[in-house]
């Protein structure tokens, strides 16, 4: 008997009987688990990466200093870029994996989680290097390893929130915020416990890169063949609310301060860029030693023109001497989203592309950029010069 019953030809309603949801992971669920933690790409996934559905032959310069390869090998990234921008005349494309330094050609990059002590909140920084001397980078690499492990531990706090009675208040808050009924909450509890058990049972086989919050979303998506889409959709809405509550409670004490990260990175010749401007207004006020500010991001589009004018006004006033603040835009593309079947993709994330920042060609924004002499080609040349 099916645990989820489709009611009516159009399946407008979905009910779930928790008595018929197995308490232990089934073989099907075990297979789903190993599927979502796998870093091996199938032939279909390779095609999805190397043969993008849309290309941009009219874009002549490619600037991408905020994007995440995740488990996609760099040679496949290169093939995708060649297909996306067949007439590119110049590029600066640097990967910025979360808390892991990755290399592409002569350049390396990372997006670092840290915190701003003056404002007591988590922030992120983009670090970029050219020809980094790894033997000199031991301290930075240890800082990144520590941050990666601590940030990964949030997954277990997330799972514990979903299954442990001690965090019942968090679940009740998430349920109230999303109007989630008890059956869906119960379903999430059962499946989250299975996921936690599978993680602990197969600890030695789980790649480090898989230990992140999105594993929960991916695992539930992998259950769609067994459970009604409406049940999984409701579960995902509830899970997202619970995750945000976990993130708000996650201690900042074990992150490095932004100033410490910048100091160590600068000692190695790094360029530093502030991403996600609207999320991190305090960091813009802290006057950190940075090369640039991201004025546009798929998650941060509301104040682009304002930020462009702020940066240019500060530069004209000579606040930053001979190294004016550069204007960047971040595509914040996560390539793992491209690996999923189209029906399983998050549309808002799937539309992102490495090197694609439509704001450069927006007429209103472009007007501000032209007045201030800013374009992709100039930013590429200046930032490349600073990194060399």
What are these regions (language model features)?
Residues 2-91, 99-157, 225-259, 263-388:
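Charged catalytic cores and adjacent phosphate/nucleic-acid-binding surfaces used
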Residues 117-118, 132-214:
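Non-catalytic, alpha-helical, charged scaffold/linker segments
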Residues 212, 216-231:
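Low-complexity, highly charged intrinsically disordered N-terminal segments
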